[in-house]
Amino acid sequence: MSKVYDWFEERLEIQAIADDITSKYVPPHVNIFYCLGGITLTCFLVQVATGFAMTFYYRPTVTEAFASVQYIMTEANFGWLIRSVHRWSASMMVLMMILHVFRVYLTGGFKKPRELTWVTGVVLGVLTATFGVTGYSLPWDQIGYWAVKFVTGVPDAIPVIGSSXVELLPASASVGQSTLTRFYSLHTFVLPLLTAVFMLMHFLMIRKQGIFGPL
């Protein structure tokens, strides 16, 4: 085993990387409230794992979406647990994100030189809200359908581009299969990818600049 480790160590300098990670200075004022961002990340990872598991059973069509969700909840092995954990972690992620934003704002973590860290955090907040909107529609029940109708109609109030945006969101003149397909693609591919990229940027900037001062 040591020979395998030595082989990788010679090429990748694993020990130097580990030393850099474990030797980072943690200020004495850091407390449990500084863990809210990490908890948000944990919730996101749980979402990815449980969401991936449900893609094996979910069918993104207006005729089969609701039935496939019912199958997950009633017949698939541990499907009810996986979907419940997905929903609970979604709620927890939103709550932890809101508390994290308040903590950062109250401690002045958005000030120079951490403006870009704050900007990436705001983008992550918007992505999280979009996760909620797109995920809410996927069961394609009455609540999900009318939620989509409401959300896709909101941009109509925007001057000049409002009508074009309304047609862009549902991907057709009315809410239907094209809308569900688009929301499913956003929820399972586009949003997770963007969130992962911005989370990486967010954490790298925190790593570089360190944690802001005490409350």
UniProtKB/Swiss-Prot annotation:
The chain crosses the membrane at residues 32-52, 90-110, 116-136, 186-206. Heme b 2 binds at residues 86, 187. GO terms for cellular component: chloroplast thylakoid membrane. Binds 2 heme b groups non-covalently with two histidine residues as axial ligands. Binds one heme group covalently by a single cysteine link with no axial amino acid ligand. This heme was named heme ci. The keyword DNA repair does not apply. The 4 large subunits of the cytochrome b6-f complex are cytochrome b6, subunit IV (17 kDa polypeptide, PetD), cytochrome f and the Rieske protein, while the 4 small subunits are PetG, PetL, PetM and PetN. The complex functions as a dimer. This is Cytochrome b6. It comes from Pisum sativum.
